[in-house]
Amino acid sequence: MPARPAQLPPFLVCLAALAPAMAQSAPPRDRVVLVDGKELRGRVVHEDANEVLLRVGTTDKAIARKLVREVHAVAAHHRELLQQWRGSSPEDPVAMLRLARQADEQGLPHEARLFRWYALLQRPDDVELHNALGNRRAGKQWLVALGDKRVPFDRADAMGVDFAAAWRLRSEHFDLRCAAGLRTTLDTLLELEGQYHAFHAAYGDAVRLLELCEPIPVHVYRDRAQMPQQSGAIGAYYKPDEATLFTCCENGRAYALAHEATHALLHHTFGRALRAKGELPAWLDEAWAEHFAGRLQTRVPGKPVLLDRSVQPAHRTTLAQIAADELLTVQRVLNLQQGDFQASTGQASKYAQAWALFTFLCEHDDAAIRATFVDYLRQAAAGKGQSSTFRKLFAPHERLLPDAWR
């Protein structure tokens, strides 16, 4: 349950279904072939059984699925590539090069470079790989670019003591600077991409999620001491005003990555990309991040697995230890502000109850309750997430809400 930095403004989010036509500009990397043979170019940002949403410039055009014969989309290729990655070992250079070639063929140049870097870690003297990655030979050494300098490949990781010399690599949806070494950089990028697709799989059926067309900046520091100063010993946070995720490396992994990546995805997918009009309530902001983090099993670096339900044992333990007369009421949870989550007093119980309420409504066995919660999400994203909206929507189910704490 990572703390958020003090005095950060709450970010704005808007569900795609409520978004204006103007959106993030996207290069025309995709093709949609109609049944009459006409071919349209743009970026496929969403498709389902009923329609294909094609972004041309900054305008999203809905095309009825019955009019579409073929769709050639980067998003689909990226999902396929990530599936292949899940079954491959990063210690197998042959497998990594096979993935790199697949990425090349499918128009995913950033991923192609990532897999070649994985291969190079196993074959550090491979001339062809060094040349493909743009490294330069200097005598018997190979020099790689770190910031505005070139340093020997075998000493590059050690340069991370200075964040200015951090590795900087791209993936389809993320732009990462990492001072914790090349392998951690690669694993973190693939972890983030896995989380991106898991986020869409987890919530895409209920909330219309569009493809992200702008990379999210992420900074991973060598340790907490290297991080920019914030109030308290904060190990991870997302800053909406900089549209950047900040975290550090702990035990070889990026700390609280899923929680903060959720904040980043919400902001970039809805607020930043679609010029949001509504403010997501603080309880929902944090609860959503905790719910998604609980739905990920992250045992293998770079390969998160999406679970059917959100699992947060620490929150369950916290709830079990709170006396009944000390539990916050549903009304109080709905009225929690960002500062309430930042305060150390009762912090664990606030996160636990927010997560429990989200989980109770999102995963309820009653389809009507789940549908009502989706309705609330849409209204909250449109700037109508006040507790009065929640109470009105859930009035028929009010007596059931305290069951969330059980």
Model regions and ranges:
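Compositionally biased alpha-helical segments
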Residues: 23-171, 175, 182-203, 208
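Sec/Tat-exported extracytoplasmic proteins
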Residues: 72, 103-107, 123, 178, ...
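Bacterial N-terminal signal peptides
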Residues: 9-19
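Extracytoplasmic/secreted envelope proteins and their assembly/folding machinery
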Residues: 51, 65, 97-100, 113-116, ...
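Acidic/His/Gly-enriched intrinsically disordered linker/tail segments
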Residues: 72-75, 162, 229-245, 252, ...
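Soluble non-cytosolic domains of exported or imported proteins
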Residues: 90, 94, 106, 110, ...
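Juxtacatalytic substrate-recognition/specificity segment
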Residues: 163-281, 382-392
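N-terminal secretory signal peptides that target proteins for export/translocation
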Residues: 1-6
